[in-house]
Amino acid sequence: MDPIALQAGYDLLGDGRPETLWLGIGTLLMLIGTFYFLVRGWGVTDKDAREYYAVTILVPGIASAAYLSMFFGIGLTEVTVGGEMLDIYYARYADWLFTTPLLLLDLALLAKVDRVTIGTLVGVDALMIVTGLIGALSHTAIARYSWWLFSTICMIVVLYFLATSLRSAAKERGPEVASTFNTLTALVLVLWTAYPILWIIGTEGAGVVGLGIETLLFMVLDVTAKVGFGFILLRSRAILGDTEAPEPSAGADVSAAD
């Protein structure tokens, strides 16, 4: 298919917005991820595994709805900054407000941490997203960068918790859980760190990259952080309820034989 014709079709559906191509692809990839997780989880009987599937399926499901809304221009507003009109997709922040706590919940379930720790993580995470949105909707550069800094500090706090408290808790659950947790945490550390960098160089910040490239990069980050995360998690034995069961020792076998 001619890519120019494909882009023209997306432009028509998206009221001439060039970024609609990437929003459409993002919608499709999120839907594929949701469907894959649903099919993979169908018939799973392990209680713990079903809990992980329930949480993880919601992540790309919510994201696909957000991307579809942005594709059709819903969740889009204009903000004037320094006399220049900027297109701001606040639907993206709505997506993150729901999906990032779910990703953290998956990690918290792996580590088996208490409710207070989970509540703290989710609360700081929500503050990170809300302050980022306030920054995106602010009309002065100083306000935008101040809120960006506030949001980034919140992100650092969340990542610190993951790399310290939760990592230690996951390590106590055995090598299978620790390995999966470390892999997922490394993925989160890399990808989540890229978000504020893209924000600051994108149209919401310094404007080094245009809205089309910015949308493409956010789409790649979102798909990897949601579908990629879920793919790694749900293929691991760490989600099964018997991961903590100790193997019988040789001495126990002898005693049983007696």
From Swiss-Prot:
It is found in: Cell membrane. The chain crosses the membrane at residues 19-40, 50-71, 90-111, 115-137, 142-170, 174-202, 211-243. It comes from the Archaea. Keywords: Cell membrane, Chromophore, Hydrogen ion transport, Ion transport, Membrane, Photoreceptor protein, Pyrrolidone carboxylic acid, Receptor, Retinal protein, Sensory transduction, Transmembrane, Transmembrane helix, Transport. Its main location: membrane. The modification Pyrrolidone carboxylic acid is found at Q7. Belongs to the archaeal/bacterial/fungal opsin family. Residues 41-49, 112-114, 171-173, 244-258 are cytoplasmic. One of its GO terms (molecular function) is photoreceptor activity. GO terms for cellular component: plasma membrane. The keyword Transmembrane helix applies. The keyword Transmembrane helix applies. GO terms for biological process: phototransduction; proton transmembrane transport. It is a multi-pass membrane protein. This is Archaerhodopsin-3.
